[in-house]
Amino acid sequence: MVGKYKVVTLCGSTRFKDQFMEAQKRLTLEGCIVISVGLFGHAGDSEVWEGMDEGTLTRTKEMLDDMHKRKIDMADEIFVINVGGYIGSSTRSEIEYAQRTGKTVRYLE
């Protein structure tokens, strides 16, 4: 909590950009401080990835994965964007991390 506001980190496949944005708006209006992804690798931001050599791409993805774990550290809970029940390996890893660190886990579906 920050003051009276719960801090929520959004997790899920970045292919669900629209659902991320909807959840962010809804949770904000419910009085939550929302932490989200910085880039949508599967649903946009192609200009970031185009032209990156394989080594840079790998290091960037590893950095983003680690940064998202730090975002989970800052949160009271995570909210999983699991459209159609889909949870990929990265999201599953984030859920397991959140559970190990005592965070509440909620799901869109």
Residue ranges and their predicted role:
Residues M1-E109:
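Conserved catalytic or regulatory cores that recognize and/or transform ribose-phosphate-containing ligands
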